[in-house]
Amino acid sequence: MTQVAKKILVTCALPYANGSIHLGHMLEHIQADVWVRYQRMRGHEVNFICADDAHGTPIMLKAQQLGITPEQMIGEMSQEHQTDFAGFNISYDNYHSTHSEENRQLSELIYSRLKENGFIKNRTISQLYDPEKGMFLPDRFVKGTCPKCKSPDQYGDNCEVCGATYSPTELIEPKSVVSGATPVMRDSEHFFFDLPSFSEMLQAWTRSGALQEQVANKMQEWFESGLQQWDISRDAPYFGFEIPNAPGKYFYVWLDAPIGYMGSFKNLCDKRGDSVSFDEYWKKDSTAELYHFIGKDIVYFHSLFWPAMLEGSNFRKPSNLFVHGYVTVNGAKMSKSRGTFIKASTWLNHFDADSLRYYYTAKLSSRIDDIDLNLEDFVQRVNADIVNKVVNLASRNAGFINKRFDGVLASELADPQLYKTFTDAAEVIGEAWESREFGKAVREIMALADLANRYVDEQAPWVVAKQEGRDADLQAICSMGINLFRVLMTYLKPVLPKLTERAEAFLNTELTWDGIQQPLLGHKVNPFKALYNRIDMRQVEALVEASKEEVKAAAAPVTGPLADDPIQETITFDDFAKVDLRVALIENAEFVEGSDKLLRLTLDLGGEKRNVFSGIRSAYPDPQALIGRHTIMVANLAPRKMRFGISEGMVMAAGPGGKDIFLLSPDAGAKPGHQVK
């Protein structure tokens, strides 16, 4: 079915320029690249761009630690990032930096328009200031005791224990992360973006169907809580763009970071001249499509601040946000001590890019679900699907065609109906690629691969080859197998670019989406060479060991759980005494509808019942097994309102996460309500 060619601009979230690309990053870039490659196969004009997010206090401070300038550091990091993405065959049309002249000009333009339209407000605020470093402290550079639940060692913007959000000035006994000094309060004039003015527009955009349901639901929670004015300025010293006519004031990194999408595209337009127009994609009434692939941790900025900034400065809004979850490895968060915090470059020293591209693709859907890279399953799936089902289909037929028929395929299809079954699947598979239901697409393709191999098994060309006078049958059977291989590889082309190149060289033809409607008949293929090698667990073991060695080389030799969760700052006895730990009896435990992580626990404190939501479902798939157990809970934690209800405390557990979560229990004899001292 012929499609009308569309103009599409696709972006990935900008990697921060103070660290290496790891397998968590690669999920997003692979997901976007597969989608982009499919769009290009269908004849659409796609511009695929990215950039390094190169501003902010963390970059300034890390450069100081390294004894180099921020410009030098981000330049070196950009080269490393681009090398990693090229190694995974991410087909960017342009990769730029937010520290660019294009981004400076666009940031100043958007700011000036927002200011002219009355959306920038000035007011004096009190901030924490490090007297030793002579700098105001951003949220994440202050730690102290949570003002809500009194948990120690929490960052200045939100508590990782109770989930509360607050300003750094609300922290109890704050300390500078930079110097360890006790900050002092100091007044400073700041600039604020009037986000509440866009509430009605944003709610209409949310209801338009342009966003994933999970994103729209989360945005509704934010609307109900009320939008707040957004501080878009930071005080010197700061690495970034100085705000026009405001000496010593700089744009907050999250203002110019998304503008980096525009800056990278402007840079591409300037390189290409008249062949692509910036305004055609970014003007208010643009008919081009704009899609941002992002992780679920930055939805707030992309779904609220970014579209509001664009609306207020007379630019177009995104067509959609495509949000994905996190990556876990072997059921737990990536771990430096276990060697599962794997850098992209380390992966490529042990496996090819296509293997990870395939595994991620096979697990991805349009939902915001976390993806688990189970390394044993990875080996089994790559061997079973790519090697045994797809590549083997070509190898078991190519030998006969090359040796007996000089590489020339039969002039007719042996089974036209089977071939039609394969080509008819283009609509379903294409729709799955289009809607980002990648796992479904892979399942459909592998079902066809099973059909193809069943056909070859039933026709048994190795038997026919030994039978006198059946050369025509042999050529027809093997030609059919090779034609089915061609269709499979066409469907997999967005996922496996390097394998596709080798397949195209063997088939002596380019693989195109529409081309499969015409089978290869009387066509000469090239001599067959091995297309893909099997992988094994020894490679996995070497990969994990290499990742461990990198951690040892980069840091002090800390091993075990302490490498992933270092011991927090020393606290006083009085600090600890604020936390009221009690023995609790689990009276009931059940799944929480709508959540794949939470269990709802009913706890008896010896005269008082509590309802607690706990993220331990992955470790306790049978909640009934918890009923009757004693555990330890934080009894004086402030109640927390969640989408599923009110959580009235927190149970204590240990472990890295995933299936390795272990609920703490007291020794026999402890009673509900007993205090832990």
Swiss-Prot record:
EC main group: ligase
Signal peptide range: none
Motif placement: 'KMSKS' region: 333-337
Keywords tagged on the record: Aminoacyl-tRNA synthetase, ATP-binding, Cytoplasm, Ligase, Metal-binding, Nucleotide-binding, Protein biosynthesis, RNA-binding, tRNA-binding, Zinc
Catalytic activity as recorded in UniProt: tRNA(Met) + L-methionine + ATP = L-methionyl-tRNA(Met) + AMP + diphosphate
A GO BP annotation: methionyl-tRNA aminoacylation
Cited Pfam families: Anticodon_3, tRNA-synt_1g, tRNA_bind
Subcellular localization(s) per the UniProt record: Cytoplasm
Cofactor remark from the record: Binds 1 zinc ion per subunit.
Gene Ontology MF term list: ATP binding; methionine-tRNA ligase activity; protein homodimerization activity; tRNA binding; zinc ion binding
Annotated binding of Zn(2+), by residue: C146, C149, C159, C162
Motif stretch ('HIGH' region): 15-25
EC annotation from Swiss-Prot or TrEMBL: 6.1.1.10
tRNA-binding domain boundaries: 575-677
Any single GO CC term annotated in Swiss-Prot or TrEMBL for this entry: cytosol
Binding site for ATP: K336
Names of the cofactor(s): Zn(2+)
Quaternary structure (record): Homodimer.
Family under the similarity heading: Belongs to the class-I aminoacyl-tRNA synthetase family. MetG type 1 subfamily.
Function: Is required not only for elongation of protein synthesis but also for the initiation of all mRNA translation through initiator tRNA(fMet) aminoacylation.
Protein name (database record): Methionine--tRNA ligase
Organism field: Escherichia coli (strain K12)
